[in-house]
Amino acid sequence: MPLSFSLTPADKTFLGHQARTAIEAGLAGVYSSTPPAPPQGLPDDVLTRSLGAFVTLTINHGLRGCIGNIIGHEALYATVWHLAAAAAFQDPRFPPLT
């Protein structure tokens, strides 16, 4: 059965904020493996679905980190949180962000 969904502008804003916050927490040395939950009242539950994702970091249009999963293992908001930190600090092709 095909999976169909779309992200709302509010979902995209939240996920972008989630990724930036995870990286900022890692840079500050206060990263937690427990991500902040999405705000109540978003129109769809797509952020809580178990979905795969990729987080790609670029600096000056060049690849700086990319980590992802094609299969979901946890809620999308948590996946983005963990993958953002992994792309910033654990991509074996690049030194960790500082």
Question: Regions from the language model: what does each represent?
Answer:
Residues 1-98:
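Basic nucleic-acid-binding interfaces
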